Regions:
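Membrane-interface extramembranous regions
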Residues: 1-136
Length: 136
């Protein structure tokens, strides 16, 4: 049984991840700029690849039947894109302070998001089956 709280968290997270995936295609230049340029083959490739991943992971989180795999996939995705957050923080070091706050704020926020995805995953665990019947 899933608690109502973690059900809501999963649906909200899934919706936000899906919207982020859409934005990778609607405004790819923004995402290109935060991809570390040393990653082959190109920034646009990684923008689209992470957008596709988000478009897959988001709905997996929303649908209760696929939520466990969605939560694990979300954790993997959030860990995989963390280098882009680090690069963004470094790359934005000369930007106005309000933009730097956004870049620095993403670093600890990513840990919170991973923790939330983990909590969604653990909320979906099947309770252990108790066998109170005596042995034959």
């Amino acid at each position: 049984m899933v608690s109502a709280r973690w059900n809501r968290v999963a649906v909200v997270m899934g919706t936000l991840v899906t919207l982020a995936g859409v934005m990778h295609f609607a405004n790819p230049t923004f995402f290109d700029d935060i991809v570390p340029p040393w990653l082959p083959p190109s920034e646009r490739f990684w923008t689209y690849a992470s957008g596709v991943a988000e478009l897959i992971v988001g709905p997996l989180l929303i649908v209760e039947r696929t939520r466990r795999i969605g939560a694990v996939s979300a954790i993997a995705l959030f860990v995989a894109v963390y280098p882009a957050n680090l690069y963004m923080t470094w790359d934005w070091r000369d930007r106005p302070w309000n933009e730097q706050i956004v870049a620095y704020g993403r670093l600890p926020l990513q840990f919170v998001i991973v923790w939330l995805a983990w909590k969604v995953f653990t909320s979906m665990r099947t309770p252990a089956v108790r066998n109170d019947r005596p042995a034959r």
